[in-house]
Regions:
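A C-terminal functional module that forms or caps the active site or interfaces directly
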Residues: 3-108, 112
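Short, flexible loop segments at boundaries between secondary-structure elements
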Residues: 111-120
Length: 120
């Protein structure tokens, strides 16, 4: 059985290295802020924006927004010269699961869980 093209290849991936961080808003923003360096971007949700101290692209406030904005956000990372990206993990249920599936492929399956100690 052959895999469908959507399952075989890394789609819609920017040039930057993407790592998905499975974390709540506080853990995500604290970790990303602690990693500040040239070329670092956050791919975040609207609730994270007030706390980030690095360049970011918000996917929006809910799963529908995230699905709508993901591909444009990935292209924008290239346009803005991102070299490394930490992306907050979307919900793995409902529409969020579709967003997660596209994002995990763009991240070449790089995902880490933050446990409150800011270690990825």
């Amino acid at each position: 059985r052959a895999d469908s093209p959507g399952m075989k290849y890394k789609h819609y991936a920017p040039k930057a290295k993407i790592t998905i961080l499975d974390a709540d808003s506080r853990e995500f923003t604290e970790y990303v802020n602690s990693q500040k360096k040239e070329g670092l971007f956050a791919l975040c949700f609207e609730e994270d924006v007030p706390f980030l101290q690095v360049p970011y692209i918000s996917l929006g406030k809910d799963e529908t927004d995230q699905a709508k904005h993901l591909f444009a956000a990935l292209r924008e990372l290239d346009e803005r010269g991102a070299q490394e990206v930490y992306a907050r993990c979307p919900s793995k249920q409902g529409v969020g699961l579709a967003v997660y599936n596209r994002l995990i492929r763009a991240a070449a399956y790089q995902e880490h869980t933050l446990d409150g100690e800011s270690e990825a």
